[in-house]
Amino acid sequence: MAGFPLFHRNPDVSDELYDDHILDHFESPYHKGHLDCPTCSHSDRNPICGDQVTLELLVSDHHVVTEAYFHGKGCAISQAAASILCETIEGKSLAELRDFQAQQMLELLKVRLTASRQKCALLSFKVLKTMLYSLDQPALPCSDVEPTPAPTLAE
């Protein structure tokens, strides 16, 4: 993709959308990449615009996020939001993250967004919430489950 800029300003969009805070996180993202051995990982995409985000977390035995990384592709808003989210959630407990709300995520971006751009901004938040939900579900033990006997026909 040589010759293509990493970021293209749409002349039809207000400069307010491309606030320095967003541009800084888009051009120099925090923890963009992969963890060697994440505790949990989840991916999602926005089918309308094609944004994709994978979030990888390293969670301590005390249920605290010690490292958060992301990777993906998409618009400046979705990728900057993922960077901001990773920076924000490190050091937070899973309980604190369960209480983290979408409005708080939007406030971290420091720009006003249209409804369609909010979907881009909240993609990584959605990935985080889905991951937290899956962590709350009890795991099914693989080796302790006895197979269910096949039904027999009564004679």
Label the model's feature ranges.
Residues 74, 87-94:
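Flexible, glycine-rich terminal cap/loop adjacent to redox cofactors
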Residues 24, 56, 86:
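A cross-family signal for key residues in well-ordered alpha-helices
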Residues 49, 72-80:
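Short, thiol/selenol-centered motifs that function as redox-active sites or metal-ligating centers
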Residues 59, 68-75:
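A short interface-forming secondary-structure element
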Residues 2-36, 41-42, 66, 92-96, ...:
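C-terminal binding/interaction regions
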Residues 38, 55, 77-79, 96:
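Basic, gly/Ser/Thr/Pro-rich low-complexity segments located predominantly at protein N termini
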Residues 77-85, 122-126:
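Short amphipathic alpha-helical face segments that pack within enzyme cores
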Residues 46, 51-61:
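Short beta-strand elements
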